[in-house]
């Protein structure tokens, strides 16, 4: 029998052990170190935990200490002596690194800047070191040893196994139950074919509240009874359900109703052949009568083609509607002056002209709306590109062209008034528009003048359906203007203005001015008496706000605190009195 190897757990960590430890921590976490150590043959649970917390944890900081961190380390070592775990957590560094850095700082101060001790990184792999968990891992030497291969294979098998023994047993039991159920169904089917009807055995219930999904309806809630009697309908439904079950048990679920029998097929085929032979003997053609039915003869209406209006008729009707719409004219144009018979060229020319005018109006309206927008509130300058500058120039040119075109249109559209002898009598009644009321425009968001304010006032009155009332002073002023205009005589000579009201004499004016001056001086003297009162009032307010109110609040707070202490003392004295009374009563009873 070969000797059993004895492992002394500990020593330098290898690269394979570090990788196994990382994978085990990912699966088992940082609280089940006994399970983690079971994957490592030469390491204990304590050593695995120290290795993770001192070297492998990705949260640890292994960079060089800065001056601020050195100062913080010295302060913490002075405040928390020999509590290196706590200091390491606060510094986010391993405890051994903090100890070595602290010793190095002390030795450098004692020796004048030369460090004498060796740190963790100064030791070589393989040297005897009690703090092997803080050392670097030993690199792999080519091929792995047999022990390392065995340890790695076992760790891989255990870490890759996501199902434990209990889960595997549950899966095996579930598969066994499924196979039993399938065998039971097969046996019942064979017995039923042999004429023996065997009912399905109900499974045993572990609890009294278990649900049989083959018999019961899961979580069924019976509907509440209504106001009408439905017992007759229930009996009919139950009877139909029983008939359906008997039919299914006898013929199956689908039945044979959808399958045409062979006898019916043969009878139908023979009947068709006999009918065809009889018609052929009589000389009748079965092509039109048997294959399809002739459609009913429907003649189209006159002026249409196959029951539909022709394309030319549609086009002509639309053209007449357009001509009638264009010949209506404006609202104030008399009917006698409207053109009744015009040629196709005049209509096309007027259509083109009206389309251009409509486009120009829309474009001008858009330009005006963009111009009425408020100026931007940004502070930076907006530099226009060359394309935008060209567009602005085109808009300016377009506005000029539009003004010229409008002037020319006004000259062309001017209609000379007919003579009194030849002109017919024109009705001055305006043709009403298509709608009874005009649409109400929107408010101007940023009114910049009195006209804009007046416009917004008119819009508000229109929305509220209130008449726009002229102020009384304006009405009086207009009446006065009209009365004066009646007395003005127009002539070629210069106009003479006569003042109806005479100016008062100079003495009266001086007396009124003197009286006003005296009243002003009297008011100033009264104000001199008010100024000391104002100053006194300000002083009293400052004293009240800065001294009296804070003192009152402080006294109130102190009173509440003293009163609370007083109440606590009273409660304690009352409890002490009750205890003494109870003691006296007990002693007297004894």
Curated annotation (Swiss-Prot):
Residues 244-263, 271-281, 337-351 have a biased composition (Basic and acidic residues). SMART domains: SANT (SM00717). Residues 1-60, 63-110 form the HTH myb-type domain. Residues 244-286, 336-355 are annotated as: Disordered. Changing residue 102 to G: No effect. Slower growth and thermosensitivity. Complete loss of function. GO terms for cellular component: cytoplasm; Prp19 complex; spliceosomal complex; U2-type catalytic step 1 spliceosome. Residues 33-56, 84-106 bind DNA. Pfam families: Myb_Cef (PF11831), Myb_DNA-binding (PF00249). Residues 460-490 are annotated as: Interaction with PRP19 and self-interaction. It is found in: Cytoplasm; Nucleus. GO terms for biological process: generation of catalytic spliceosome for second transesterification step; mRNA splicing, via spliceosome. Keywords: Cytoplasm, DNA-binding, mRNA processing, mRNA splicing, Nucleus, Repeat, Spliceosome. GO terms for molecular function: DNA binding. Present with 784 molecules/cell in log phase SD medium. Involved in pre-mRNA splicing and cell cycle control. Required for the binding of the NTC complex (or PRP19-associated complex) components to the spliceosome to mediate conformational rearrangement or to stabilize the structure of the spliceosome after U4 snRNA dissociation, which leads to spliceosome maturation. Its absence leads to an arrest of the cell cycle, possibly due to the inefficient splicing of TUB1. Belongs to the CEF1 family. Belongs to the NTC complex (or PRP19-associated complex), composed of at least CEF1, CLF1, ISY1, NTC20, SNT309, SYF1, SYF2, and PRP19. This is Pre-mRNA-splicing factor CEF1.
């Amino acid at each position: 029998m070969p000797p059993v190897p004895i492992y002394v757990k500990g020593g330098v960590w290898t690269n394979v052990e570090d990788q196994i430890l990382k994978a085990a921590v990912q699966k088992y976490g940082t609280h089940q170190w006994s399970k983690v150590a079971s994957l490592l043959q030469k390491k204990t649970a304590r050593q695995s935990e120290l290795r993770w917390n001192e070297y492998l944890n990705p949260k640890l900081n292994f960079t060089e200490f800065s001056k601020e961190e050195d100062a913080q380390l010295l302060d913490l070592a002075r405040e928390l002596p020999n509590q290196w775990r706590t200091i390491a957590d606060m510094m986010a560094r391993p405890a051994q690194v903090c100890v070595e850095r602290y010793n190095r700082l002390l030795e450098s101060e004692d020796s004048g800047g030369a460090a004498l001790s060796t740190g963790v990184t100064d030791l070589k792999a393989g040297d005897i070191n009690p703090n092997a968990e803080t050392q670097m891992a030993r690199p792999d030497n080519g091929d792995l040893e047999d022990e390392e291969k065995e340890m790695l294979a076992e760790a891989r098998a255990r870490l890759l196994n996501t199902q434990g023994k209990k889960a595997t047993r549950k899966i095996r039991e579930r598969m066994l139950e499924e196979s039993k159920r399938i065998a039971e169904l097969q046996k019942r089917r064979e017995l039923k074919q042999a004429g023996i009807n065997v009912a399905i055995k109900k499974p045993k219930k572990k609890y009294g509240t278990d649900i049989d999904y083959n018999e019961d309806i899961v979580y069924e809630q019976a509907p509440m009874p209504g106001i009408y009697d439905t017992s007759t309908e229930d009996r009919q439904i139950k009877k139909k359900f029983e008939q359906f079950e008997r039919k299914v048990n006898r013929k199956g679920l689908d039945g044979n109703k959808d399958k045409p029998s062979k006898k019916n097929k043969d009878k139908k085929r023979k009947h068709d052949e006999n009918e065809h032979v009889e018609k052929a003997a009589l000389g009748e053609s079965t092509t039109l009568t048997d294959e399809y039915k002739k459609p009913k003869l429907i003649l189209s209406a006159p002026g249409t083609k196959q029951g539909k209006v022709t394309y030319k008729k549609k086009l002509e009707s639309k053209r007449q509607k357009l001509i009638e719409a264009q010949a209506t004219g404006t609202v104030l144009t008399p009917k006698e002056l409207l053109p009744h018979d015009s040629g196709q060229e005049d209509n096309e020319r007027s259509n083109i002209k009206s389309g251009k005018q409509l486009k120009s109006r829309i474009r001008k309206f858009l330009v005006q709306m963009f111009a009425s927008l408020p100026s931007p509130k940004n502070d930076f300058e907006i530099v226009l590109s060359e394309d935008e500058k060209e567009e602005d120039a085109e808009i300016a040119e377009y506005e000029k062209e539009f003004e010229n075109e409008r002037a020319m249109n006004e000259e062309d559209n001017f209609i000379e008034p007919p003579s009194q002898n030849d002109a017919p009598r024109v009705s001055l009644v305006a043709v009403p528009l298509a709608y009874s009321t005009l649409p109400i425009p929107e408010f101007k968001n940023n009114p910049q003048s009195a006209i804009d304010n007046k416009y917004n006032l008119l819009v508000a009155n229109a929305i509220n359906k209130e008449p726009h009332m002229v102020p009384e002073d304006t009405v009086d002023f207009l009446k006065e203007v009209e009365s004066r205009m009646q007395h003005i005589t127009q002539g070629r000579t210069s106009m003479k203005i006569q003042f109806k009201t005479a100016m008062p004499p100079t003495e009266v004016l001086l007396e009124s001015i003197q009286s006003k001056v005296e009243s002003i001086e009297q008011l100033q003297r009264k104000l001199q008496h008010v100024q000391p009162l104002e100053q006194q009032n300000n002083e009293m307010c400052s004293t009240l706000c800065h001294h009296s109110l804070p003192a009152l609040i402080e006294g109130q707070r102190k009173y509440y605190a003293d009163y609370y202490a007083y109440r606590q003392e009273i409660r304690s004295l009352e409890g002490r009195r009750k205890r003494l009374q109870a003691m006296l009563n007990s002693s007297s009873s004894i």
